[in-house]
């Protein structure tokens, strides 16, 4: 199928969650999840046509809900349709929707599973409180054994600090996976560059070292050197797209956009951020794993899954995702850079 040509940060309207985590960014933004319903403006067959490779190129589409992504079976059907359209998929989920994970295993072909990554967020203390740790770890292991690329992600919240060794050992013993870490963001004010921790940043970064997490190391680099003053191809080679409404924006913090599902006979009107980033720091490391700022030495996708994590991904995913989109674009279109 070839390498990806675009990264899509995809939103879906799964506006409910079965967990209640203290550091949840939606909770910090006072976004209530209890009574909300899951609503989708377009049906899946229409979305599949709207997301054709002819319009978008081959994409890596990361799906995430405002709540638990897989709480709605619709997301599994959407992911399969996007795979049928020729794309690669990631689904960020909390690993507890056992029936919908089973439905995914039963409805995806082997080839589709090989083009699907499952990012399992691990909410240790909340899962322990609800007595669902075993269910979570069993689901992760089962999906890995079924041919999916799997990834355990732990947001390094202060409440986990006393349990870090236990968490790491549990993931290795029960799921055969060394987890990755991410910085916990203070989302109560998205205009500021702040981590949600009472620790000094020096000690906070030190706590992550035993995990040898390339993802955390990239997050740290982006925190210390926000890179928002550099020329960025978000809005063109990477976008934020709400699959429930069809509305596309440049990225999480840059709001230029439009509905790209209204007139699917027309080209997608991409508009890159360029020098005009409005974010306090680039807190979505995936944008830089796929290289939306040219000329940087940030890690590749294969670096994230190197060493003891190598067995968690397929060669198909490595071949497709091991690229720097902006560097490739600049080489192919030298006349269009920094327009």
Language-model-derived ranges and their functions:
Residues 50-55, 79-84, 104-115, 137-145, ...:
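Acidic (Asp/Glu)-rich catalytic clusters
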Residues 7-8, 28-41, 57-72, 83-100, ...:
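Core AdoMet radical
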Residues 190-323, 327-330, 334, 338:
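Accessory C-terminal segments flanking Radical SAM cores
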Residues 123-244:
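Radical SAM enzyme [4Fe-4S]-AdoMet core and its adjacent flexible, acidic
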Residues 36-46, 295-302:
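Short cysteine/histidine-rich metal-coordination sites, predominantly Zn2+-binding motifs
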Residues 46-66, 311-328:
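Short Fe-S-cluster ligation motifs
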Residues 38-50, 76-77, 101-104, 130-140, ...:
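Well-ordered, non-membrane alpha-helical segments in soluble/globular domains
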Residues 1-42, 252:
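Canonical Radical SAM [4Fe-4S] cluster-binding loop centered on the CxxxCxxC motif
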């Amino acid at each position: 199928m070839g390498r990806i040509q675009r990264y899509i940060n995809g939103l879906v309207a799964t506006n409910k969650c079965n967990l209640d985590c203290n550091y949840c960014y939606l909770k910090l933004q006072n976004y209530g999840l209890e009574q909300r319903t899951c609503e989708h403006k377009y049906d899946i067959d229409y979305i599949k046509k709207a997301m054709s490779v002819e319009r978008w190129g081959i994409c890596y589409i990361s799906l995430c809900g405002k709540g638990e992504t897989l709480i709605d079976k619709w997301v599994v059907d959407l992911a399969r349709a996007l795979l049928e359209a020729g794309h690669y998929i990631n689904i960020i989920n909390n690993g507890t929707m056992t029936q919908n994970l089973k439905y995914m295993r039963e409805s995806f072909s082997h080839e589709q599973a090989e083009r699907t990554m499952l990012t399992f967020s691990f909410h240790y203390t909340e899962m322990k409180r609800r007595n669902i740790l075993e269910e979570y770890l069993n689901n992760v292991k089962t999906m890995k054994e079924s041919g999916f690329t799997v990834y355990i992600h732990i947001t390094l919240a202060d409440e986990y600090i006393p349990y870090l060794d236990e968490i790491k050992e549990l993931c290795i013993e029960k799921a055969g996976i060394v987890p990755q870490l991410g910085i916990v963001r203070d989302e109560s004010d998205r205009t500021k560059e702040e981590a949600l921790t009472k620790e000094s940043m020096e000690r906070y970064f030190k706590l992550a070292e035993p995990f040898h997490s390339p993802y955390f190391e990239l997050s740290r680099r982006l925190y210390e050197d926000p890179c928002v003053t550099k020329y960025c191809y978000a809005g063109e080679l990477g976008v934020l797209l709400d699959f429930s409404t069809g509305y596309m924006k440049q990225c999480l913090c840059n709001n230029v956009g439009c509905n790209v599902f209204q007139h699917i006979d027309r080209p997608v009107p991409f508009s890159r951020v360029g020098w005009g980033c409005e974010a306090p720091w680039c807190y979505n490391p995936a944008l830089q794993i796929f290289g939306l700022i040219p000329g940087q030495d940030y890690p590749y996708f294969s670096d994230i899954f190197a060493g003891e994590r190598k067995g968690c991904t397929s060669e198909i995913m490595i071949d497709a995702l091991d690229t720097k989109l902006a560097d490739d674009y600049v080489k192919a279109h030298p006349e269009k850079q920094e327009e």
